[in-house]
């Protein structure tokens, strides 16, 4: 039997994961100086600097920091860059179409514009960069990391016709200097005001299946995952995984040509399982077990999705993770 608020939770996901979580508007109050996040007056229902992981219909779209209404931002170019980054974050396919080949927005995984507990929150994230990236085998800047998301989660490589001829596709792909990347960086740096470089972010890494609870990939059953998906997930995501629309709101596709490509982090079994386990369903995250989340993840990542054409350049200096099921193993 489904939990008592399942249908309500489904409604919230439909509306909250659609990407555009706030209207396009300009701040109405006079500008005031920026202040560190820890001094910002958060409402009682918020958990520290984040939205609580459990929420209600009334609070499902709350934002501790909303640059479209925050009076601390003025009419300067710097403030407008933050606002543009927020718009790209919440409607990536619409606001950064040249680098978003599918229908995935940053907001689809990083809920509440990157400000929700246990939903891959990004508050303070700028303080951790540069950071070593195992897949690339080198240190990444924040902008490098954003580029990686465009290439993989937003499938910017989907427009490449000849991956062997760099001259034919170089102009199609984002760089750290691209204006969309710089705008997203400005928004994330704004979310990170008050955090010193190297800051310990206690909410980082919460979306992980504990290593001791990970089921070997070969023991996971896509058919069992499908049964769970049909019972637990279709209210919001539909039987075809493409999302059920209510008005102009729709969850992002979980597979197919408009989903993330097979080089994305969500294309890894345990990574996606951690998101499912702790961030879903939208109003009642955490009601699925570790096993259920992993089985559902195995089902989703047994589906076809766009191919990342440069997988052969990944993990050249680090071992290939055992849950990277779309990669060719030596």
Place the predicted regions along the sequence by residue.
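Positively charged n-region of N-terminal signal peptides that target proteins for export
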Residues: 1-5
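Sec/Tat-exported extracytoplasmic proteins
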Residues: 89-96, 110-113, 149-157, 188-195, ...
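Extracytoplasmic electron-transfer domains, predominantly the class I c-type cytochrome c fold
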Residues: 36, 79-84, 116-169, 253-307
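Sequence/structural segment immediately N-terminal to covalent heme-attachment motifs in c-type
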Residues: 77-113, 200-246, 251, 269
